[in-house]
Amino acid sequence: MAQQEVVEGFKFEQRHGKERVRVARVWKTRQGQHFIVEWRVGITLFSDCVNSYLRDDNSDIVATDTMKNTVYAKAKECSDILSAEEFAILLAKHFVSFYQKVTGAIVNIVEKPWERVTVDGQPHEHGFKLGSEKHTTEAIVQKSGSLQLTSGIEGLSVLKTTQSGFVNFIRDKYTALPDTRERMVATEVTALWRYSYESLYSLPQKPLYFTEKYQEVKKVLADTFFGPPKGGVYSPSVQNTLYLMAKATLNRFPDIAYVSLKLPNLHFIPVNISNQDGPIVKFEDDVYLPTDEPHGSIQASLSRLWSKL
């Protein structure tokens, strides 16, 4: 998105913004139920302010403190509950429409996973606890109204105690890992998916559409990893499982054009301990040493043939 310019005989690109703007917004219904979101917002603006770099002329700059204030002002204006995606688009649209010199904006948001608590089997009106995985989004908006919207998950920790193996890989003089058709598999999923909407005018109008989609994608990813509740599904490698998770996402959601997954292979090492008198701990698929350093790193992306990505 950045426009390259030639200044004083050099190629020059620039952008500026504000990072780690933390905002929480509470909505209260007439029935007494409260809703809360907590977001960490990052803003990047592309604008015609080259004079601020070349000379003492700041007249074209949107101050980063102004960007910060705008986050709180726009949060205040949102009288209805909205998704992180909707707020990111709202902010980006504001910056490109409100400021003549701004040609494009990137707004990224990480949502802290506050979840409503249940007390005595009933959802609490205003009580929340912190969950684990985080909802992320990035909206890229240009003055023309073009849009690129990406959502994601960070820190989705999943584990299977069986139904995983790894055999017939390349062996050489450096290989010590034995073949196995029975192992534990664990990972912390980082997922990104890009929607096919290419303009501000083509977005779904259903309230909280993207929040629902986030929950649905998370379920598809987890269900594909685990398999059916009775018996599960065998994983011959993290690579194969990753591909099946990405494919299931594209097959399930026609308005998603691209999926990227990163699945670190978090190891559970079988424990065998012996001394001169014999075994102290004999491994029988029961006692493990959990470790995430070092760990395998498996990542891939999948997109539709017509996708521009």
Swiss-Prot record:
Which pathway, metabolic or otherwise, does it act in? Purine metabolism; urate degradation; (S)-allantoin from urate: step 1/3
Q: Which residues bind urate?
A: 64-65, 166, 183, 238-239, 265
Q: How is this protein induced?
A: During nodulation in legume roots after Rhizobium infection.
Catalytic machinery residues: 18, 64, 267
List cellular component terms (GO): peroxisome
**NCBIfam families, A to Z:** urate_oxi
Motif Microbody targeting signal: list the residue ranges: 307-309
Q: Which organism is it from?
A: Glycine max (Soybean)
* Places the protein is found: Peroxisome
Protein's name in the database: Uricase-2 isozyme 1
Read off the InterPro entries from this record. Uricase (IPR002042), Uricase_CS (IPR019842)
Its predominant location is other
What is stated as this protein's family in its record?
Belongs to the uricase family.
* Enzyme Commission designation: 1.7.3.3
